[in-house]
Amino acid sequence: MAKIEWTDITRNPVKGKCPNACPYCYAIEIYNNNKWDPSIRFRPEVLDDLPRKPCRVFVGSTMELLLFPEWLPAIFDRCRQHPEHTFIFLTKLPRELPKWSPFPENCEVGVTVTDREAAHQAFFYIPLFRAKVKFLSLEPLLDDVTQYLYFWNLVRAVDGIIIGGMTGRKGKLMQLQKEHFPQMRLEKLDAVGRKWTLLPRLEWVKRIIEEADAAGIPVFLKDNLYKLAMERPVEDHDLYWEDMSTLRQELPRRSCGDQGVTTLKAVVTSSSDHPKARVTSGGGD
């Protein structure tokens, strides 16, 4: 599985093929290709197999964990037992989040928003739960959701925004584009064409970044948006780029903990500062 840029490691305490079966799900394809056991089973001990050095741990990268409420208390207990680490949860079921509020202090909680319907759900439920860091993952971004960020002020209810395209096999993406997403563009990510992505429209991404900057909210652009960001007008360079060759990949300051996060390039100061202000994280491996 490709590296997820905004985390250090992944851990999956619930094994098996995710029942959500989203059409763009990379995890189901991995299970099918490797002929892994699709049965659902609980393996909480994976959350004890962690590095000594504080790091960011994405919990449930291949599974919708909120489908299994009977196992969540044990998962959160494991998180509390490792306060040196930051545990990241991401869900497409925001309606379930208030049931588990408040979340442990070392947990970040995100909601996946791919289209307007998902944005509507996020708008309603994100204010109803408590977490040290809340964020939106607009990945894959399949529609223009700016009206929810602006008119409904959703952007000010979170501490960070991730934006990305849909990466996968060319054949599968071509079919999805034809049947569901004709407004998106198919591009190869590498010279030999092994990796492809469906790119959102540049104007969608630009409006989201502008709304986030106006609110002082950090923006993390996934690497699969590199080609899209190359097409921006010269005057919009700073919207997309950290420097001449590095995409903006920012995290909220408080997501770094006392030790800081060494594997990510930068974090953003609080919204009381200039919205584009950045501070470099500490040294280390």
Task: Describe every region a protein language model picked out.
Residues 63-65, 93-95, 113-115, 140-142, ...:
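Active-site-proximal loop/turn and secondary-structure-junction residues that shape catalytic pockets
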Residues 1-108, 116-130, 146-155, 179-195:
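Conserved Radical SAM active-site core
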